[in-house]
């Protein structure tokens, strides 16, 4: 090849590769979950309720991630943005704030909401927000048949299913759905997991490690707690 044409070849190759690169982008709708807010709970240690703000979000993210048609944003990415931008510092997060966070993490939908635990009677209200318009598309309330604190995991599973439907996602395959229903995380383990996330966000690795381990002891097959333990230990 003549010298003057040699530099053109790599450039041409690069141009030819560009459509393939852009075509490989993830076009699935992004969903992100904000920390849930305590709507006025009684009967437990306050630290448990503070922790559930993270834990409910963490478990909903895990359940939504079962659907391959969605791109679910990691909880830590949302929390990092909230901390960096001091969003929701007053304890209140509205749809506009959620939409702002959603745009920053590249989500189409944001999930936000509140929970109330009145001496063991548990309720969760979730709101699905359109990131483009800041509009609340749907308020999804937990199944009134699942109101006991001991049924928290089943309650969150059912809530995630409804959020998938409201986000126009296809239902889970029967195989994935059956595997999900075969799993039931005890509330004790979920509480420990929530505490671990709280300490992780506070930068207390020792406490986070302790509570991830407690969650795994209470439920040895707790994949989310095992993954959390790897993150805080740097494995």
What are these model-derived regions, one by one?
Residues 26-95, 110-117, 139, 178-181:
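Short beta-strand->alpha-helix linker/helix-N-cap micro-motif
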Residues 79-186:
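Catalytic-center loop of serine/cysteine hydrolases
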Residues 181-200:
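Alpha-helical tetratricopeptide repeat
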């Amino acid at each position: 090849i003549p010298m003057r044409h040699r530099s053109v070849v790599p450039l041409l190759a690069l141009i030819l590769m560009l459509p393939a690169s852009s075509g490989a982008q993830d076009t699935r709708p992004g969903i992100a979950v904000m920390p849930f807010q305590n709507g006025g709970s009684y009967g437990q240690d306050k630290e448990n309720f503070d922790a559930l703000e993270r834990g409910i979000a963490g478990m909903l993210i895990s359940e939504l991630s079962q659907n391959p048609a969605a791109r679910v944003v990691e909880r830590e990415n949302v929390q990092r943005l909230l901390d960096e931008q001091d969003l929701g510092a007053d304890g209140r997060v509205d749809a506009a704030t959620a939409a702002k966070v959603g745009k920053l993490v590249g989500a189409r939908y944001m999930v936000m909401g509140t929970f109330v635990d009145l001496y063991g009677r548990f309720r969760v209200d979730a709101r699905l927000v359109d990131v483009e318009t800041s509009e609340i598309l749907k308020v999804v309330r937990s199944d009134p048949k699942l109101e006991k604190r001991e049924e928290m995991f089943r309650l969150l599973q059912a809530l995630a299913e409804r959020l998938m439907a409201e986000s126009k996602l296809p239902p889970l395959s029967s195989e994935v759905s059956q595997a999900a229903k075969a799993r039931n995380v005890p509330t004790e383990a979920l509480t420990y997991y929530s505490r671990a996330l709280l300490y992780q966000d506070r930068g207390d690795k020792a406490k986070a490690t302790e509570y991830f381990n407690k969650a795994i002891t209470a439920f040895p097959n707790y994949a989310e707690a095992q993954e959390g333990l790897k993150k805080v230990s740097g494995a």
